[in-house]
Amino acid sequence: MFRQHSHCSYCGHPFEADQAWPRLCAACGNISFVNPLPVSVVLLPVDDGLLTVRRNIEPQIGQLALPGGYINRGESWQQAGARELYEETGIIIQPEDLREFRVKSAPGYNTLVVFGLAQRMRAPDLPPFSPNDETQEIRVLTAPQELAFSTHTETLREYFEVKFNHSAAEARSILQNAVSQ
């Protein structure tokens, strides 16, 4: 049976089955790491809600999630967020308009998720949506609910807590400051 990360990526020598990370190769001395993968997720306020996508790919196909995905080599988290938002929804935003909302390690610590807050859009200004390889539909949520990933659910809840636990003016100020910083 194949075990992922069971051999040195430099010389191919097998690691001990219970060897801790990072792993030092006994044959060549190379040090191997298994680091979390970086992910960029976009919080796009639309009117009084937040944009979500219904996933058309695994994991969690058919479930609602915030738009986002893996950060490619050579991309900033803002560039990745803008790219993923466009790929999944057809919506264009400028990477420099994204502001950090929160950073969270996903359960199991296999991914490190950067949640970026985009500038608010009006629903009539959104481009027409067509289902694609990654997204079945887009939906604007106006209250917290369970999403495909626990980090998305927690972040959605936090977004609405900031929005609803303050006066409308305070919430606008808090969220606008997050976008303008």
Where are these regions (language model features)?
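Acidic, metal-coordinating catalytic segment for phosphate/diphosphate chemistry
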Residues: 1-41
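Residue-level detector of conserved, well-ordered beta-strand and adjacent loop positions
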Residues: 26, 54, 142
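Short glycine/serine/proline-enriched coil/turn segments at secondary-structure junctions
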Residues: 34, 60, 107-109
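A generic structural signal for short beta-strands and their flanking turns/coil linkers
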Residues: 38-40, 60-62, 94-97, 112
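Short, hydrophobic/aromatic-rich beta-strand segments within well-structured domains
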Residues: 41-43, 51-53, 114-117
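Conserved Nudix-box catalytic region and its N-terminal flanking loop in Nudix hydrolases
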Residues: 45-87
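Unchanged
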Residues: 71-158
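Charged phosphate-binding loop/patch that engages nucleotide di/tri-phosphates or the phosphate backbone
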Residues: 158-181
